[in-house]
A protein has these predicted regions:
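Nucleotide-activated sugar donor-binding and catalytic core shared by glycosyltransferases
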Residues: 1-239, 244-382
């Protein structure tokens, strides 16, 4: 191939952007690759802050965000806009990340245009199509479409092998560990609200926003957190509340007015990573944070019934707390009361990456198109 390889990276939400940004920067280093960025802006405000943080500009901005749009509307808008962009650019490969609606629609648009797809963060599974919804089905379907599968861990690769997916599978580590090399430098916060937090206290960083937790599960979680705050007045819970009206109204109802719970605006990637780095522990239903916090040596309680990231549970850095009020409270109280239990989780090995996932993915693309040496797989330290 005499011309440069046209690699189009497609993403639309903040978590995707955090994990794709270091890959875009890596692709730009290779003279054999022409890197093109296409954003759908499924999360407009949150996405822009990440792009600014990494100094990345979009070549194409589909700007699909509309008030109150459902999954069908997002999917059809991405498909229609992507058709035009793909016809104009004619990339050699389209890279999508993870399991969002943008991921699925972007991969499907590339498939319809007969363009190969590379799936970053491939092979994560719960094997329950309804949990997480719609992410589990999205990533499974993208697994059928993709030609190159970039699995963060050996376990993810085994899932793909069992499913007999077509194409080549590479164990790369997770790109979020690469991203943290950019974000965790220094301790200064952008957010004024974070500058007011007293980090001499035991700070608990918290997030809760997943669609499958809407309703009673979220009320259970917030009830446990409220009780924890009231019973441990020396601890401070910092909760950047998602922009979703469902999440905001429930958080304000159940967590508002408690002196040691700070409900703050959503954070950019830099502030979120630095908040976790200075916190005592983390409570979250986020997928990415299950990978990020262990890299910082922080125990994580996962506020979900199941996780597609079992490696950290096995390693001991993460515990599945579920959405039962009593169980969440018990596990959080144990970490606040029992130094030995805390140390066991804080000192466990991070199984998700060594900060070299992006170079491995770039090398895999060069290997596929130019016959270069394939990358060595990521193997966690023991």
């Amino acid at each position: 191939m005499s011309k440069r390889i046209k690699v189009m990276s497609v993403f639309g939400t903040r978590p995707e952007a955090i994990k794709m940004a270091p890959l875009v920067l890596e692709l730009q280093k290779h003279p054999e690759i022409e890197s093109i960025v296409c954003i759908t802006a499924q999360h407009r405000e949150m996405l822009d802050s990440v792009m600014d943080c990494f100094g990345i500009r979009a070549d194409y901005d589909l700007n699909i965000m509309q008030q109150g749009q459902d999954l069908t509307a997002i999917t059809t808008r991405v498909l229609e806009r992507m058709r035009e962009v793909l016809a104009e650019v004619q990339p050699d490969i389209v890279l999508v990340h993870g399991d969002t609606t943008t991921t699925f629609a972007g991969a499907l648009a590339a498939f319809y245009a007969k363009i190969p797809v590379g799936h970053v963060e491939a092979g994560l599974r719960t094997y329950d199509r309804w949990s997480p919804f719609p992410e589990e089905m999205h990533r499974s379907l993208v697994g059928r479409i993709a030609t190159l599968h970039f699995a963060p861990t050996a376990n993810n690769a085994h899932n793909l092998e069992r499913e007999a997916v077509e194409g080549d599978i590479f164990v790369t580590g997770n790109t979020v560990i690469d991203a943290m090399a950019y974000t965790v430098r220094g301790e200064q916060f952008v957010s004024d609200e974070l500058r007011q937090v007293d980090f001499s206290r035991r700070v608990i960083a918290m997030t809760c926003h997943r669609r499958e937790n809407y309703g009673q599960p979220m009320r259970n979680i917030f009830t446990a957190v409220r009780r924890l705050a009231l019973n441990y007045p020396d601890a401070e819970i910092v909760y950047p509340v998602h922009l979703s009206p469902v999440v905001r109204s429930t958080a304000e109802e159940l967590l508002g007015g408690v002196p040691n719970i700070r409900l703050i605006a959503p954070l950019d990637a830099v502030d979120m990573h630095r908040l976790m780095a200075r916190s005592y522990m983390v409570m979250t239903d986020s997928g990415g944070i299950q990978e990020e916090a262990p890299a910082l040596g922080k125990p994580v309680l996962v506020l979900r019934r199941e996780t597609e990231r079992p490696e950290a549970v096995t390693a001991g850095t993460v515990k599945l707390a579920g959405t039962d009020t009593e169980e969440i409270y018990r596990l959080a109280a144990e970490l606040l009361d029992d130094p030995a239990a805390y140390d066991r989780m804080a000192k466990a090995v991070n199984p998700y990456g060594d900060g070299r996932a992006c170079p491995r993915i770039a090398q895999a693309i060069l290997s596929h198109f130019l016959g270069a040496q394939p990358p060595e797989p990521f193997v966690p330290a023991h």
